[in-house]
Amino acid sequence: GKEKDALKTYEKVLTLDGDNLQANIFLGSYFYLQAEKEKKKLDDDFKKITSPTRMQYARYRNGLSDVLTNSYSKAKTYLQRVLQVFPSMEAGNTLERIKKIEAEIR
């Protein structure tokens, strides 16, 4: 439950101060980790299928596309804000990983 409270609190902070470093770092990291978890589940579930049909493959690709659109894109937005305010190597590395994932999925 506290995770959702923290999420709401940081989102409120950003409505008052869009460049707040802590809030952008937290939200960027949160959405990135959520995306990684969702992607791993999709990958694991798909790997369990020995010979996937076209429909199963299409469902898998659509799932990846949803994760990209919903979670990775949100993470990217917050992490880009971090870099505008503070030269964070970690945020930069995470953005690079997101770019690679975008290239794989598209």
Question: What are the roles of these predicted feature ranges?
Answer:
Residues N20, S88-E90:
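Residue-level recognition of tetratricopeptide repeat
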Residues G1-T9, S71-T77:
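Structural signature of tandem alpha-helical TPR/SEL1-like repeats
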Residues K12-V13, V82:
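Canonical positions in the second alpha-helix
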Residues L33-Y78:
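Short coil/linker segments at helix-helix boundaries
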Residues F26, T94-R97:
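Canonical tetratricopeptide repeat
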Residues G1, G28, L33-D43, K99, ...:
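Short coil/turn linking the two alpha-helices of tandem helical-hairpin repeats
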